[in-house]
Amino acid sequence: MVGWLSMPEAMITYRGVVYPWHCDHMGHMNVMWYVGKFDEATWQILAAVGASPSRMRTEGFGLVAVEQHIEYKRELRAGDLLTIRSSVLEAWEKSVRFVHQMTNEESGELAAKTVVTGVCIDISARKARALPHDIFRRIASLNE
């Protein structure tokens, strides 16, 4: 199966707060924490399409990030509540592209956005392989 898919509605994949230790010398959340929170959101969307960590371990496959582009839009400060909403932008036989949007829950402002491309690999062979068919079908069903 090869194809382009889009998911029109985003799902909530992360809710959290900015703690003081997330902030740098300028008083806003440091970039390392954006990446970490986006990574947590990725695990949630993967699980939603059937690619849970336990399944990956059991079946010997994984999804590895091969590209990530981040846009920082608004600062987040200690105490800010945030939500990440995620969608699948595209999926092909061996790869998938997600978008995550991080918003300040109180103001509703977009704080950051990232697009991540992941490739499915065979853990033992360390080579790209096809996404399991049921996962590809679940991604497709999100668009229905």
Write out the residue ranges for each language-model feature.
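Terminal targeting signals and extreme-terminal segments of soluble enzymes
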Residues: V2-T83, L89-E144
